[in-house]
């Protein structure tokens, strides 16, 4: 009788660190202030990511106030800023980035404004699923489901609304990276 009572009374009443329905991925394993990383392919710099803080979750890293620089041929082709960012570390999205909250991109050929933006590293293109605005000089182009190369030389969108001025647009622009879906 005493043994049964001891087993019953000695049960732990501590709450586990993560709730049973919470995935292991959601529980951060490391948090850093002033985070910085870069991605290279065959020794060639492709992008850099700098943020105020980062939280490592196993297959991805959350970043607060990220700044991303995307490089082509060793030169910055676009600089992106947002409120939140995510770097994917494995799987089909490996080395890709997801930015949310007041995303602003600046390239030599214009500016980009949206709420959600994906840098699809393998394809070498930007994708904004929701409304995006591209500004070149006085020209403004608004649409959804934007696909673009990082210099904004080539942009494709649906549900277009625009005010375009010839002085801001170059005829027959073509970029070496296709923007069509894979």
Could you say what each language-model-derived stretch is?
Residues 1-182:
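Mature-chain termini and adjacent capping regions
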């Amino acid at each position: 009788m005493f043994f049964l009572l001891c087993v019953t009374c000695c049960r732990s009443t501590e709450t586990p660190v993560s709730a049973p329905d919470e995935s292991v991925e959601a529980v951060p394993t490391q948090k850093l202030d002033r985070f910085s990383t870069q991605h290279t392919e065959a020794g060639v710099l492709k992008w850099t990511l700098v943020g105020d803080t980062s939280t490592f979750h196993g297959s991805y890293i959350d970043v607060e106030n990220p700044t991303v620089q995307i490089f082509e041929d060793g030169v910055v082709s676009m600089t992106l800023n947002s409120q939140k960012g995510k770097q994917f570390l494995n799987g089909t999205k490996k080395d890709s980035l997801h930015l949310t909250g007041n995303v602003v991109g600046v390239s030599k050929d214009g500016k980009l404004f949206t709420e959600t933006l994906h840098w699809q590293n393998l394809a070498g293109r930007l994708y904004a699923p929701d409304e995006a605005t591209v500004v070149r000089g006085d020209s403004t182009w608004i649409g959804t489901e934007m696909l673009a190369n990082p210099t904004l030389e080539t942009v494709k969108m649906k549900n277009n609304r625009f005010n375009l001025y010839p002085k801001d647009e170059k005829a027959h622009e073509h970029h070496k990276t296709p923007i069509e879906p894979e």
